[in-house]
Curated annotation (Swiss-Prot):
It comes from the Eukaryota. It is a multi-pass membrane protein. Its main location: membrane. This is Transmembrane protein 125. InterPro entries: TMEM125 (IPR028165). The chain crosses the membrane at residues 36-56, 68-88, 114-134, 147-167. It is found in: Membrane. GO terms for cellular component: membrane. Pfam families: TMEM125 (PF15109).
Amino acid sequence: MSEGEAQAPRGRGLPPDVLAEQVELWWSQQPRRSALCFAVAVGLVAGCGAGGVALLSSTSSRSGEWRLAVGTALCLLALLVLVKQLMSSAVQDMNCIRQPHHVALLRSGGGADALVVLLSGLVLLVTGLTLAGLAAAPAPARPLAAMLSVGITLAASGALLLLGLLLYQVAVSGHCPPARTAAPTTRSDRSGNGSVFSISGQLSAGQRHETTSSIASLI
């Protein structure tokens, strides 16, 4: 029973140190946030890519200028989000980053994802408002209905992205635990390990005493 009590604190004290040294596990922290940000990234790539291809494929002589510009911007935006996701996956697979703050920046749900969503929302909002403003100016050769509908759709999508990012940042800052709370735990674990070693030394001394007594009785 004493050996089990001596091994129990050691088993409880080792995992935090072991987990802290495993860089691969830093990428999988906070899986819910990672899954949410990955879903948003997939939605951005699919939505912007499909919208850009649709605008580029429907380009005609009457609406060639704005459809070509907006379609190209949407395709580039989808490519930017895709490159960020591929870069994070490549860095994680190569395991070339050893700093915790760098991992927290590049992993799914980190600061880089928030920056990409912010940039995407601003681009969509500005593009949508620009199209809506151009559609408000009457011109005989300009398809006002199509331009206005595309502008309103892009502006609404950008506003929703920015609002969702704001709510996400508020929720993350409200539920984020302080980073300095891990230091007392480490000290207590180390002190616990020290007591385990002293107890195990006493146990080994007691076992040697019992062994010596049994040999003397046999003689």
